[in-house]
């Protein structure tokens, strides 16, 4: 069995985390629906759609097929979360809710950057 590169290991860990997010969305949709913007029709449907999006991105990264496209689409989805969920939540509510929204936004900014890095480097050969 060959040695796995640090880059590939990082991609696998990132994919597993995205897959877990997707599973959480599918199995906890009823508790996550509260963060879907009220002006967006469909409610719980969007929780399921994003869950499937996370899982499909994870699969693409794991099997290394269409990884660049999957990661860039994942980054766009996370940027949409920032603009439609986290930023509005930081503008209103009690101080603890605003602080939580800030933390979630920072987490998603980090995930966006990771998705861009994984996608950007997906077609480069692994080096040790």
What are these regions (language model features)?
Residues 1-27, 46-52, 56, 63-128:
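Extended, low-polarity transmembrane helix blocks
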